Amino acid sequence: MPFCMPKINPEIETFARIKVIGVGGSGGNAINHMISSKVKGVEFICMNTDTQDLHKSLADKKIHIGKNLTKGLGAGMNPDVGKKAAEETKAEIQDTIKGADMVFIACGMGGGTGTGAAPIVARAANEQGILTVAVVTKPFSFEGNQRMKLAENGLSELEKEVDAILVIPNDRLLMIADKDTGFKQAFALCDEILR
């Protein structure tokens, strides 16, 4: 029996529409690393309350969340501000992710924007029936107990809204770095892992 190639109807999309969203400073850094590393086949979106960070983004689509609330100055390590900022901009977030088959959310937990806004972004995706996966980092222990507590609370909120979550404790990354790794290099390593 001869082998026959199946007929492909060009009108049927054969690839999943994947959107990768970097939320907050760490998420934006991760997006920039992915773009610089020539990751293809996905749409990159950066969301932040801090307009200076947003201007540094290489993403095609940038969303300034919480314009009225933060005036572009960031969330000040306050997840409640990050949450309210995302809620203020929820309609734009929903429009941006519309049509995706899968959404990846990249962010760092323990600050204001990523910690507070990521669960709202995830909820917007879930409400549209989009498979939603979060890839997040937890703070280094040297960043202090307050930041770790914010991270734990944020993770608890995010877990309720995603289909799957990958948590990367930054302290574990130090195990693969050598003893001469500086702070800046350690944070760059975190961005590389999120990529």
Region annotations inferred by a language model:
Residues M1-R195:
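Tubulin/FtsZ superfamily GTPase core signature
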